Amino acid sequence: MILLQQVWLPLPNRPSTSPPMSVAARSTGTLQLPPQKAFGQEASLPLAGEEDLAKRGEPDSALEELCKPLFCKLCNVTLNSAQQAQAHYQGKNHGKKLRNYYAANSCPPPARMSSVAEPVATPLVPVPPQVGSCKPGGRVILATENDYCKLCDASFSSPAVAQAHYQGKNHAKRLRLAEAQSHSFSDSAEAGQRRTRKEGSEFKMVTTRRNMYTVQSNSGPYFNARSRQRIPRDLAMCVTPSGQFYCSMCNVGAGEEVEFRQHLESKQHKSKVSEQRYRSEMENLGYVQ
């Protein structure tokens, strides 16, 4: 009997996990949300300029005026939210404008100054110029046709590349132009030599003819063997006291009027006249050689 009574004892009531209505009401009534910040206060983020100022330890009021929470006067950009402001102030464009601002005010950050000053301290050793490539051992290697093309001013990395260049159209075109120029130079040199020979022979021929008509006389320098010969007016300034025709410009003389007029019509005389005219014009303009 005792055992049966112990088995059939009523179980105690467990406390319910749900709180009473009054407690729930009190908990919901006392629940407070965190205070929301104003729209202008949300954008108070750490700016790139403020970080640089914190590193420098010197407040820059002018930079603070330029970098507002929602407006960057330094970049002339209007910002709509805190996220956009953070992205702008941490971007590359704002950092570049900030570096330009420091450079304009002659106050770069000290970290940059130390990084720039280190390579300057290393002494510079002048290297004498050398022709060709030089190995560390000191041996100079001269460039060959497989390394460099002097005509096209092109360098090659391997003999295969050099062979392809020499068989190409550009190299062939340059080669034809160089050959044409060399031929033109040789032709002009030969023409100049022929011209000098022709001029020399003409001068000798005229001088020999002048010597043929020269009359030896003891009557004086103003003796004219053909005083009765009529001298035309256009050649009056070209007659010597001895009665010979003389061209001072070409240093050529002739005994007869026909021969002298042939000289005046020659290419040698005309070229000398044009050259003298050009020199006189240049002297009148002030270009004196």
From Swiss-Prot:
PANTHER family attached to this UniProt entry: ZINC FINGER MATRIN-TYPE PROTEIN 3
A UniProt-annotated Pfam family: zf-met
Molecular function, one GO term: zinc ion binding
Protein name (Swiss-Prot/TrEMBL): Zinc finger matrin-type protein 3
GO cellular component: nucleolus
Biological process (GO), any one: apoptotic process
Organism: Rattus norvegicus (Rat)
Renumbered zinc finger spans (Matrin-type): 70-100, 147-177, 245-275
Role played: Acts as a bona fide target gene of p53/TP53. May play a role in the TP53-dependent growth regulatory pathway. May contribute to TP53-mediated apoptosis by regulation of TP53 expression and translocation to the nucleus and nucleolus.
Induction profile: By DNA damage in a p53-dependent manner, and by 6-hydroxydopamine (6-OHDA) in PC12 cells.
Expression by tissue: Highly expressed in brain, gut, lung, and testis.
